[in-house]
Structure formats: structure tokens, C-alpha cells
Amino acid sequence: MSSALLLAPGDLIEKAKRELEQRSITPLLREKGSTEAKSKLKEDGEKKNKSEKEENKIHDDRRVESQKSEGGGPADCQRGAGSRGANCATSTGGGDGSAGARTGIGGGGVGRVDSRSGGRGGQGAASDGKGVGKSKTGADRVANDDATRNVGSSEVSPGGITSGGLQGRGGLVAKSGECGGESLDRIGGCSGNSKTEGEEAKAGGGDRRIGGLATQEIADFVKKKIGVEVQVFSKGMSNLFTVDKSLLKRGGLGREDILHQSDIVKEIRASDKKVKIIPLSTVKRMIAEFGGTEEDEIKAVQTQSSSIRYISNRMEDVSRAKAMFTAPTGDEGWKEVAKAATQRPNIMAYVHEGEGDGLKELLHLIDHI
């Protein structure tokens, strides 16, 4: 029997890998260093340029805002001292408790970060550490109870504290409603994560079902039966799969292998009661748990007399291909390969234009060439 080569789209070869392995057919796939890689490189470059432009725009916007705040606010802030209710970052006159955007706590209203005269009895809460003055009411405290309760608000509270308030000398720590009532850090961000460990574990997929078989010998037996490789149980898994004794005996496993499985089950039940023991009494039950195909079907596939031994989507294999199978595909380089193949006079070409991806038709062709 000659070792023939079949051409087919790359994505179809990927889908058929398990069936090709059963038929002892070697896939020869084109390396992703040609069309796909160039396309991806171009796409990555465009994304990078877009990201850099957006980042530069953000920096420019921040610089403009910074210059505005340093150079003074509206005209009424620069002209007048003591204008009632002016929304200024700095003030040369006292004013009567005007509300500033960058403020601490002042007398009767909000004091200034850069206050030079402090208002009428205003209390400077800025980081320059100026002394505490007297408020209108004569109180020496930093804020009243209403101010403390409303510190998370974005509006000026009755006591005169805004959500942008800094920590004063009295040790008042602001809490923001946006952070779920958690303390703010020095730059105004939330100080911690509000998720619990259990919620994070669930978000990371910690509840997913994970399990294995008792021994490597049993794992080999299962692979032979259904053609699927199953891992051996290890610490941290949530399920232990046990194979029925009669199945193991019929599969050629000895008494020691069967007893070894029983011992492992006893040990796990004693050491970790959270592990679930799942019995597998039939081959169909194995297939339901792990997928795969029954042993008789595997043998039937492996003994089919196909001359195909290689399947490829590479241009360099066109000259030695016996046949070509083509179908609608996402393989970007396949169009050129198929075009080159059809120019050969002695190649057999098969085209799938019906419903589905063409996998079933490809395998049918392989089995009958």
C-alpha cells in the first residue's frame, strides 16, 4: 500500500485531529509565520498606534487641566477678594465661607487649600499645616457630625465638607460612597478590595468539576477502551472516578490493580470527605463522563484500508499530493494552495459545497481512497 498525501484546509485538519490519529494519518500544517502572522502583526501595530494616540490625548487633557488650576480659575476669582460664593481654588481675601473645588474645612463654609488670610475665622485643612483659627460659632473642632456623615457626597454638605476633602490635622478620614463606604487612600482611591475570598474563588472557576482515576494502570485501560487520556487523581481534585471490578478483570487487569483502587478509595474517604467518589460501571458511562468512542469502533477505524498517510495544507506538498479536498474555510493561505493544486493534471479534486463544515465528507473520502 502506497503512502499517499491529501491536501485539505488547515482548520478542517485541526478539527479532524483525533480521527486522523486513529487512522495513523500524520497532519502537516503550515506554520503560522506566513499570511496569518503578517496579518496579525499588522493588526497589532494598528492597535498599538491607536492606544498610543489615546494615551497622548489623556496626558494632554490632564496637562491643560493642571495649567488651568495653577493659573487661576474664572475672572471673578482673579479680580476680587472676598466675593461671596465664588468657586475658586485660591483666594486672596477671606470671603464668607465660599465653596472651593480643592478645599478643606473653613469657618461657616469651606476653607482654601492655598488660603493666605483664612477668611473670617476659617480653619485651614490644607497640607501646609497652618494653625487652626476660630470658626463663626467659636468651635475649635474640625467638623461637626453632619459633615462627617455627608463626607461621601459630591455636593457641599451643611457642615461644608466636599467629597474632595483632604484629611485634616484632626485625623478625619473621608469615606466615599463610590467605594462602598471604604476608606480612601491618599490619592483618593479605594483602599481595598470589597470581594470576599469565596467570591474571588468562584470568579476564578474554583467550583469547576475536576477529577481523575485511581492509578495509571486504570488510566491506560480507559484510554484503550474509549480512546481518551484521563489524568490520575491527585490532591486538590474534587472527584475520584472508580472503574467497576468486572470491567477491570475483562480488560486484563490483575487482582493487585483492583485492590490498589480499593485502597486509594478508602484513604481518600478517610482523609478528605469533600472528594466525591464517582463509579464507572460500564463503557457507556465512561464515554458519558470523558467522551470518546468504544474500543470496537476504534479498531474498525484503524483497520480500514486507506492509502492516505499524510494530510497537508502546505504549498510545498502540492507536487506530491494524490488528491485535494476543499470546502468553505477560514484558512487564509488555502486559496493559493488550492489554485496551485488544480493546475496539476493528475490530481483528484473533491469539493464540498453542501451544509456543514465538510468534516464528515473529508473522513469518508479518506476511508475510500
UniProtKB/Swiss-Prot annotation:
GO terms for cellular component: viral inner capsid. One of its GO terms (molecular function) is structural molecule activity. InterPro entries: Orbi_VP6. Residues 17-169, 184-208 are annotated as: Disordered. Pfam families: Orbi_VP6. It is found in: Virion. It comes from the Viruses. Its main location: virion. Residues 29-68, 137-148, 196-208 have a biased composition (Basic and acidic residues). Belongs to the orbivirus VP6 family. This is Protein VP6. It comes from African horse sickness virus. The gene is Segment-9.
